């Protein structure tokens, strides 16, 4: 069957659901998908099972990798990332967050904010998301007096992490909306959420004029066609027939893009902000991996050593309880990759939780790197610092 061509009739935005495990992120994503398929006859409804689609996730009932679905409202075309909330899988949340322009933070009304609520807010802020909407879920299970307290608590938390104090809160039951798609009362919260998204989120400024760059999130082999790399276009534009370079982790190599697709539809060209699959000529599945970047030729180079400014989280923010010294070896998360690196402190003996400090880092493998790129620092399954590259040393 021939694939249809993607029609760019509405502005495109990447939005995601974030929040603590079991607060209802995937249920909300499914409820939105089902609601939009009722309103817009062309849309395909995805049930909870379709979004949580790895066997291990079904068994544990949690989302591991970020999942993508698409839907349209009156004014926008959304690509929606369902981000994992489970602690071990927060690294996938980082790559999910790196693809989002705005986020919906889920908080269960019956339990309030939890540790991962804070970690996700911090990561969202570090990944450059500047507006969120709070969805207060499981309203049917919560004591009405408690709900007011949870609202106040969540807004305080949202402000603490640098988001606006007038961040909108939508209340409802995602499970109710998902289970009763034909009941207007049950789906009212979804309608309200989508209207709030259309009106409150700012359309991001896309870097279309800069040289093309996409961070590889996943790689597939399609029989008879070749290798497809997927990810979000960070900047620039890509067309079929364009020559590109695959940079980072391994030797840099050149290839030609022979196809561009988004949500199984053919794109005339992919542009900044699009989540796409690129078909690459003469590249074997084993020759390319998550964490590399595909870029316009000669526009980005791989490096190991850089100087950065970092902020170390306090114990209360879920960071380290003790200082670290030169020789500290945590994981550094850039775009879609994590690499171990060694920290050197200059003119300072140690770094305390809560400090803002400049450090020098040497990674164990080269990755595609440019100035001002932000990263997260993690150890033992938690985020301990966030930073930005000041200069590349070698």
Curated annotation (Swiss-Prot):
Catalytic activity: GTP + H2O = GDP + phosphate + H(+)
Enzyme class: hydrolase
Chain residue ranges for the region called G1: 19-26
Region (G4) location: 137-140
SUPFAM superfamilies on file: EF-Tu/eEF-1alpha/eIF2-gamma C-terminal domain, P-loop containing nucleoside triphosphate hydrolases, Translation proteins
Residues engaged in binding Mg(2+): 26
Matching InterPro entries: EF-Tu_GTPase (IPR050055), EFTu-like_2 (IPR004161), EFTU_2 (IPR033720), G_TR_CS (IPR031157), P-loop_NTPase (IPR027417), Small_GTP-bd (IPR005225), T_Tr_GTP-bd_dom (IPR000795), Transl_B-barrel_sf (IPR009000)
Renumbered residue ranges of the record's region G5: 173-175
Main location (coarse class): cytoplasm
GO molecular function: GTP binding; GTPase activity; translation elongation factor activity
Any one cellular-component term (Gene Ontology): cytoplasm
UniProt-annotated binding residues for GTP: 19-26, 82-86, 137-140
Residue ranges annotated for the tr-type G domain, each copy included: 10-205
EC number assigned by the record: 3.6.5.3
Subunit-level organization: Monomer.
Cited function: GTP hydrolase that promotes the GTP-dependent binding of aminoacyl-tRNA to the A-site of ribosomes during protein biosynthesis.
Sequence similarity: Belongs to the TRAFAC class translation factor GTPase superfamily. Classic translation factor GTPase family. EF-Tu/EF-1A subfamily.
Protein name (database record): Elongation factor Tu
Species the sequence originates in: Borrelia turicatae (strain 91E135)
